[in-house]
UniProtKB/Swiss-Prot annotation:
Transmembrane segments: none annotated. Involved in iron-sulfur cluster biogenesis. Binds a 4Fe-4S cluster, can transfer this cluster to apoproteins, and thereby intervenes in the maturation of Fe/S proteins. Could also act as a scaffold/chaperone for damaged Fe/S proteins. [4Fe-4S] cluster binds at residues 149, 152. This is Fe/S biogenesis protein NfuA. One of its GO terms (molecular function) is iron ion binding. Disulfide bonds: none annotated. GO terms for biological process: iron-sulfur cluster assembly; protein maturation.
């Protein structure tokens, strides 16, 4: 479920040494399965462990995960990275905002997952997002842009050179993508 690097385990062990005896860590997701999902790590004293928690035993510590967060922390990684500027703890949870779908799931679900997990995080840097409205019988993914993408002069390039290429590469059964958005240029538009 969660991989914690040796460096991160050593970092946590050092922090836990200053806590009450038996204290471990808890890894959790707030608002799991939503675009606002946020992951976190906190101390978990022995009296805070719930019967429904999953205990993940590592060499230097135990990480507890609550029942609701568990599916969203699948494939999560915690690392402790040191560079010229200092060191920091990183937590990558690719499924926090949306549960990973099975390879044999319907095309609509697989495309939606790709949009939410791969494409929207890139568009979010410009305050934008894209939603899958439908997949036509002819095999076209009909998309709607929102936020900073609505009315942006670069939306055609983003659609054809970015999103379409990525989706066609990942889903050969698609014929292409089409934009359903009625673009309204305004202050919200990125370019």
């Amino acid at each position: 479920m969660i991989r914690i690097s040796d460096a991160a385990q050593a970092h946590f062990a050092k922090l836990l040494a200053n806590q009450k005896e038996g204290t471990q860590i808890r890894v959790f997701v707030i608002n799991p399965g939503t675009p606002n999902a946020e992951c976190g790590v906190s101390y978990c004293p022995p009296d805070a462990v719930e019967a429904t928690d999953t205990a993940l035993k590592f060499d230097l510590l135990t990480a507890y995960v609550d029942e609701l967060s568990a599916p969203y922390l699948e494939d999560a990684e915690i690392d402790f990275v040191t560079d010229q500027l200092g060191s920091q703890l990183t937590l990558k949870a690719p499924n926090a905002k949306m549960r990973k779908v099975a390879d044999d799931a319907p095309l609509m679900e697989r495309v939606e997952y790709a949009l939410q997990s791969q494409i929207n995080p890139q568009l979010a840097g410009h305050g934008g997002r894209v939603s899958l409205m439908e997949i036509t019988d002819e095999g076209y993914a009909i998309l709607q842009f929102g936020g900073g993408c609505n009315g942006c002069s670069m939306v055609d390039v983003t659609l054809k050179e970015g999103i379409e290429k990525q989706l066609l590469n990942e889903f050969p059964e698609l014929k292409g993508v089409r934009d359903l958005t009625e673009h309204q240029r305004g202050e919200h538009s990125y370019y």
